[in-house]
Amino acid sequence: MIKKKNISLFFKLLILSHLFVWTLVPYISNTNLPLDVIEALAWGSNLDWGFEKHPPLSAFFPEVFYQIFGRQDWAYYFLSQAFIIFSFFIVYKLAKEFLKNEVHAILSVFLLEGIYFYNFTTPEFNVNVCQLPFWALCVYYSWKLFEKQSITFKDCFWLGVFAAIGFL
């Protein structure tokens, strides 16, 4: 029998192992940051409202990390994984409400871990990685609106905020 405490522990271990592996392995094995990260750092140095290729949000977060951590490569790998595990958390929360079963919710995150875009491409913080949590939050708040079958200002507000941030 699987206990609720064990389920919670398994989820935490899954999240922490993803964070540890996908931050540490690229830091040890790569001799240079990925090109999209370097590009985002260059764009982030002047923080315009957009660039010829991408909206500004993917440059904003690396700049914040640069101001905090400086030229430490591991910090940018960590930034990328923080966005991924936050997405995992939102998917877990949505799956728990949708499936009404915590084991199935963890299984959904575990299956998500098997998708290429949630593991091998994640060391490179780019626009795709930056938008993942906001897409997940849009789906979560849309689900809340449909599931309740009543429209509340709070849910609409957060859906609008996360959709707008997702466009940035």
Predicted features by range, described:
Residues M1-W22, F153:
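Start-transfer (signal-anchor) and selected internal transmembrane alpha helices
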Residues S17-H18, A105-E113, A163, F167:
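Short helix- or helix-capping micro-motifs
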Residues V25-A40, G50-V64, G70-A75:
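Extracytoplasmic catalytic/substrate-binding loops of multi-pass membrane glycan-assembly enzymes
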Residues N46, D155-L168:
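Membrane-interface alpha helices of multi-pass inner-membrane proteins
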Residues P62-Y66, L79-I90, I115, Q131-F134:
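Transmembrane alpha-helices of multi-pass, membrane-embedded glycan-processing enzymes
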Residues V91-G114, L132-P133:
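Transmembrane-helix signature of polytopic, membrane-embedded enzymes
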Residues L99, C138-W158:
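Membrane-interface transmembrane helices that cradle and orient dolichyl/undecaprenyl
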Residues F120-C130:
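Short acidic/glycine- and proline-prone juxtamembrane loop motifs at membrane-interface regions
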